[in-house]
Amino acid sequence: MVGGTVARYVGLGLFLVGLGAGPARAGSITINMTTKTELTDKELSVNLVVTNSGDEAAGSVVPILRLRDHEARGAREDSLPPGGKMERTMVVPADDLGEGRWPFRVAVSYTDQNQYPFQALHVSLITRGNPLPGKAAVTKVDITPLESSSDVNLKVKNLAGVERAASVTLFAPEDIEVQGGPEQVTLDPWAEDTVSFEITNRTALTGSRYPVFAAVEYEDGGTHHAVLAQGIVEVASPRAFLPRALLWVVGALLLGWVALLLLRARSRRAVA
């Protein structure tokens, strides 16, 4: 059983760098997901439970299941109030999966009370057969705060003494666009490498926090291996840096003006 959470805050507030005041929050929607999976020879069935632990209702809630190129959508829930719960079961074909571990994605699209769209995302693994644990890992996920664009830097390590050809994918909700597709990397024995992705803010609002997921996949002896890592994208306002810069400029000008007045005063005393 796996779960995921995404939070979105809405509100108006005054941001004062010099005084340290933070933005006021008028309401929040926090989507939590729990999944139960069943994999057969032909299909993957996912039972999804969605709850809202925020204090604002989510509207037009639509769950989506994706496995490789397959997609299924659950029935829409018109409104998910605070403390509310919805449950859906979705099925996608899985007869093209060989032995090993494979990533699947569950997304929940919804709107706030102003009909602004958001999406929550969770990624997990399903297992076919009895594969050994994967011999790769994402040891670090480094994400700079997202304004208009940002970088996601992943440390990927080979945990075996053989060269490894792997595919690295970054999964993000629709609010955030990942530039480019999966990165193909070749890892030397026991080596660690950095894989970077650029992300772009499409519809994410300032103050939102979004989980994103990195998947490292490779083939070994006819078995498909996949490992996952998670990071958090924090959406910042580009304007938040302007008051800080202005504060420093104004402060420097004031100090210069005071220093000039002091010099003039000393000069007058010396003349007198």
Regions found by a protein language model. Name each.
Residues 96-105, 116, 203-211:
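Short glycine/proline/serine/threonine-rich loop/turn segments at secondary-structure transition edges
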Residues 22-26:
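Sec/Tat signal peptide C-region and signal peptidase I cleavage site
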